[in-house]
Structure formats: C-alpha cells, structure tokens
Amino acid sequence: MDILPYLTKIILLSSIGITIASIIVETNLISKIKKITKPICLISNLPEECVVSLLGNFINPTVGKSMLSGFYKENKVNEKEVIVTTIISPLPTILGESVFRVQLPLAVVILGYKLGLIYVSLNVISGFLQALIGILYANIFFERRQINIDNNNNEKIVFNREVIIKGFKKSLKILKKVIPMIVIFTLLINFLIKLGLMDVVKGLFSPIFRILDLPGEAITVLIANLAHFSAGYTTVDILIKNGVLNEKQALIVLLIGNIISVTMIYLKHSIGTYISLFGRFGLKLAVINYTISVMIKILLILLLIAFF
C-alpha cells in the first residue's frame, strides 16, 4: 500500500468530516435529536431531576454528572435513583457527544461506510442495552411516579457565517488531537509491516487471539486504541487493506479496543470525577457503571463470534 496518498486521503476526509460535524452542532440541529433520548427518559420512572441530568449528558457527561451530584447533595434524589441514572447516562452521551460529533464521521471516513456504520451501531446498541437495564430496574423496583417535562423545543436551526466560524474553531481543537494520532500510528504500523516485526507480535499473542479467531497482529489495534480511537480505526483499516483482518475480526478487535479505552478512561478520569462529585459513593457508581458497560461489550463480542 502506498502510504502517502493513503495518509493524505485519510487526513483530508477526517478534517472535512469533523469540521462538518462541528458546524452541524453549532446550528442547533443536535438539539432536535434530543427527542430520541426524551422518550427513554420519560419511561425510566425516575424523578425529574434525574431526567434533567440525563439530558445534560447529551451535551457533555461532566455536565450530567455535575447536575446529578447537585441534586443528590440537595436530597432531591436518593442513592438508588442516582445509581440507575448513572447506568442510563452512557446512552445520551454516546448519541450526543461521541457518535454525532466525532465518532461517526471518523468511523465512516476511515473504516468505510459499511464497517464504520456497523461499528458505530454496535456502540449505540451497547448504550441502549445498558439504558434498558436501568429502565427495567427502575420500573420494577421503584414506586410509579408522574414525570412532567416540557417537550416543546423552540430552538431554531441557525446557519450563518458566525456559526461556520465557530464550528470551524471547535473542529480545530478536535483535529489537533486526532490528526497527529492518525499520522503517527499510520506511519508506525506501516513501518512495522515492512520491517516484519508483526511476525514477532503474532507469535506472542496468537494463543490468546486464536480463541477469538484473531490474528496476532491485531494487538497493534489495541495499542493504537490506547492513544486515541481514531488511531485504532486507522490501524484496523491498514490491516484490512493488507489482508490481515476481515470485517468480522475487525469489529471484534475494535470492541476489545473499546473495552481497553473505557478502562483507561475510568482509571485516568472517571473514577476521580465520580469521587470528587459524590464522595465515597462515587467509587461505587464508577464500579457499577464500568462493570455493566464492559459486560455488555463482552456480550456483543460473543454474539459477533457466534452469528456474524
């Protein structure tokens, strides 16, 4: 594979995708998508404060956590309600911050429409399954309550020069993180393939990966994913183009990489955030949310192995 034309194409398309996504966010179009999460919030049988914090997660997970913490400290919600809200919270985060703003455009551009859409869909399904667990628990064990939320959305879609400039500036912040990772890992993986070190990697990890029907070289995707998910996408695409991975294997290794990324995020950021907002109770929240998230991803991997 000729690396320079490939790298140029990926950088160009990634830049266009991220920029367009950032501009779309600034037009207020994303606010219309909140209607996707509202029905789920309304049937969750949670108090209005929990629903409001869930909608905050659509904007940013830190916003949602901070709002929920405030309601908890004011005794407006109890521990069980906070736990269930935390379990449901990844869904609006996935739909809002992860998928529509960054993950979807990058996955489609780098992995292609078919593989990119399937992988992003698996992430969305993961969020829905986790939310379903929380919703079922709340409806079975919580007393039925009446929830009233204003569903009228008066925000208008705006598209002008100011919106374009603002979206472009936000895209630059994202691209400053994404582009270097794509370049570094594209060159690194290409170098390893040419050097033959992939054979060494294959020998070291083939026993474990054989169980999952993965080649030993797939470990490079996991390593790249530790730096940034876009680097993981790029590595997968390179391995597919070099005949190392097929689509099924690519999806499995991407989900494994997702588990590793989630683990690192929790170790680096989430646990500290939960504890700082909720005290000792925050550690319990982090452990519960992480455990359910990983278990669902493992389930999806097993389903891929069995049926894809």
UniProtKB/Swiss-Prot annotation:
Superkingdom assignment: Archaea
Keywords noted in UniProt: Cell membrane, Membrane, Transmembrane, Transmembrane helix
Main location: membrane
Transmembrane segments: 10-30, 91-111, 115-135, 178-198, 219-239, 251-271, 288-308
Family statement drawn from the similarity comment of this UniProt entry: To M.jannaschii MJ0871, MJ1556 and MJ1589.
GO cellular component entries: plasma membrane
Membrane-protein topology: Multi-pass membrane protein
Protein name: Uncharacterized protein MJ0880
Keyword presence, Cell membrane: yes
Subcellular location: Cell membrane
Record carries keyword Ribosomal protein: no
InterPro entries referenced in this protein's UniProt entry, alphabetically: Gate_dom, MJ0871-like
Source organism (scientific name): Methanocaldococcus jannaschii (strain ATCC 43067 / DSM 2661 / JAL-1 / JCM 10045 / NBRC 100440)
Pfam families registered for this protein in UniProt: Gate
Organism classification: Archaea, Methanobacteriati, Methanobacteriota, Methanomada group, Methanococci
